[in-house]
């Protein structure tokens, strides 16, 4: 019975990943941004900054939609189709989702307290990857030495640019909770 009480009633409440690319939000390039919508059509859906940039750059895929996006500077929500105006500063000026942002800050703070050296790549929020496989292998190994931690930080710095380069989103991105569950189970990125 306790297990049932821990599970949120809505799956969206416990999610810390983008519903477009299925990658986890972070404090850097994948910060959670909440689409405001317009006075007529309120939106409120949350996307990561990278997906929002991609949507702003390509529009809906049709030439007329791309032209309208350039003229009016608006992004159409992929879930509810509500238009959201882009501020003059671009995608990074859209307000952050305060609930998700605070949860990400708490998560980062907990990770920093767990690692006394404070890994710079993790603190900057640039590394949005899951290192579950590495974490599982390190759990039984005991605390890593300072030399291994320094080597890990150097590797994170060297590999950070390559991790940021990702394939672009396909033009026909569909949202389906079942597809998302399958993606999480197979640990693949759609």
UniProtKB/Swiss-Prot annotation:
Disordered: region residues: 108-147
Zinc recorded as keyword: yes
InterPro entries (UniProt xref): DUF4632, RING_finger_E3_ubiq-ligases, Znf_RING, Znf_RING/FYVE/PHD, Znf_RING_CS
Zinc finger (RING-type): 18-81
UniProt keywords, alphabetically: Metal-binding, Zinc, Zinc-finger
UniProt-listed Pfam families: DUF4632 (PF15451), zf-RING_5 (PF14634)
Ranges of Acidic residues composition bias in the record: 126-135
Source domain of life: Eukaryota
GO molecular function per UniProt: zinc ion binding
Protein name per Swiss-Prot or TrEMBL: RING finger protein 227
Gene, per the UniProt record: Rnf227
């Amino acid at each position: 019975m306790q297990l049932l009480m821990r599970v949120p009633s809505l799956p969206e409440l416990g999610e810390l990943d983008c519903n477009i690319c299925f990658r986890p939000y972070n404090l850097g390039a994948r910060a959670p941004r909440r689409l405001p919508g317009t006075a007529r059509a309120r939106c409120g859906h949350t996307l990561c900054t990278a997906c929002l940039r991609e949507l702003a750059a390509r529009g809906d895929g049709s030439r007329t939609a791309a032209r309208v996006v350039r003229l009016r500077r608006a992004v159409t929500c992929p879930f509810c189709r509500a238009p959201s105006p882009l501020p003059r500063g671009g995608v990074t000026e859209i307000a952050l989702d305060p609930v998700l942002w605070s949860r990400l800050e708490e998560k980062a703070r907990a990770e920093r307290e767990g690692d006394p050296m404070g890994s710079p790549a993790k603190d900057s929020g640039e590394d949005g990857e899951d290192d579950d496989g590495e974490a599982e292998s390190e759990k039984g190994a005991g605390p890593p030495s300072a030399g291994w931690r320094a080597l890990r930080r150097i590797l994170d710095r060297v590999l950070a640019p390559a991790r940021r380069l990702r394939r672009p989103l396909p033009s026909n991105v569909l949202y389906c909770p079942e597809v998302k569950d399958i993606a999480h189970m197979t640990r693949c990125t759609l």
